């Protein structure tokens, strides 16, 4: 069988698409109508380095350094990832995936702005939205702080997160309930669900705000819950949300509403 050779002018376009426009080989296949085998061979013969699966999966360049240091944003988003994020593996490449209700799509736009502003948000027929970032380095950096691949199991948080209000605000925005009762003294309410270890760490954080904090973690169906009420809830909520710069809009609005009571 005669060896297929791509014409020089077309090959220049292919190289440009592959190296500068980050178009994958399967996409080049559809665009130029050459098989993957031919495309890979021609790229190698033109001394073009073949991308890893991670690089090929990433349409846009990601800031890989964002979780290497603890900032208000990085701590907050790790807290939110603990509750509403997941890590998905394909071959040897990991994706950080966040899946929310459509009503919170603006929050996905916030994390997109933080990590990579051009990544696409996808919407489903089930009134949900999703964003995914492909990067082994970002995932590994998050795991180093004690947030595991399987977040439903116990976590082993680094001390820099245990006592970090931005991290816990992210957790509350993800799996917390803020409310109030019209009657009684315990008007303010804060509830968080999660694993036993995660909520135990939250107790440790609360003790730095209220030294005689006595609330305990209790079983709740297949997971655990902690309930805070009255001035305790109000004090902890103020420690989390007051003068903060990153938050889930509707949770911050609820905080402002109940803190005024």
Predicted segments with their positions:
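Internal intein/HINT superfamily modules and their associated LAGLIDADG
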Residues: 1-261
